[in-house]
A protein has these predicted regions:
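Nuclease catalytic cores that cleave nucleic-acid phosphodiester bonds
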Residues: 2-163
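Intrinsic-disorder-associated, low-complexity terminal segments enriched in Asp/Asn/His/Tyr and depleted
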Residues: 163, 174-178, 186
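Short polybasic linear motifs
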Residues: 166
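Short, intrinsically disordered C-terminal tails of secreted or membrane-associated proteins
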Residues: 182-190
Length: 191
């Protein structure tokens, strides 16, 4: 996208990249749409990328999470498996997606956080009630994420373009002709 926010692209993707299995998929799709990505990781997970900006944050509990939230803005896309990060991103008006492809929304985030809390509580309560961890990631999981992520990216891009067109239609251009200002509304269609 050509529009800028303080010298930066208006829509950006921020990835909580510590042990994120879908970084390659995110980069492939984002590059297709020319959307910039920032991969955030701590000093224990050094990443390299030919497309994304890699931001290494000092080690510490939730250091990456807090940095990600401090730099994302309304309309950005956040990729994280952390429900707390997703909730904070939604609170800032950003879009959030899990590495499984599930979209976090204001309608489902509270229930997801409650389920996580109950599962954590059950794991701590007894060894007899041991809840297994997640299954090994499959190729189908990657396909599901790619489809869901691209759908989100297209939706965000469409909203951005619609907002840009609305703003341009409401602009008035002024021409100076023989020292007289003439107001002419912009009626051209934006592409």
């Amino acid at each position: 996208m050509d529009s800028k926010r303080n010298g930066e692209a208006l829509v950006q993707i921020f990835v909580d990249a510590d042990a994120c299995p879908v970084v390659g998929i995110i980069e492939t799709i984002a590059e297709k749409y020319n959307i910039p990505i920032t991969l955030l990781c701590d000093t224990n997970h050094i990443l390299y990328s030919n497309y994304s900006e890699v931001m290494v944050v000092g080690a510490g509990t939730d250091a990456v999470d807090y940095k990600l939230i401090s730099i994302c803005h309304k309309g950005d896309i956040v990729v994280s498996q952390d429900y707390g990060v997703a909730a904070m991103a939604l609170g800032k008006g950003a879009y959030a997606i899990h590495q499984s492809g599930k979209w976090y929304t204001n309608n489902n985030i509270d229930q997801m956080r409650m389920e996580r809390h109950l599962n954590k509580k059950a794991r701590r309560s007894s060894h007899k009630n041991h809840i297994k961890g997640p299954k090994k990631r499959t190729e189908e999981d990657d396909v599901r994420f790619a489809q869901s992520f691209e759908k989100m990216l297209m939706m965000v891009q469409e909203k951005f373009q619609k907002n840009t067109k609305t703003k341009r239609k409401s602009m008035t251009f002024y021409f100076v002709y023989h020292s007289t200002a003439i107001s002419v509304p912009d009626t051209s269609k934006c592409s």
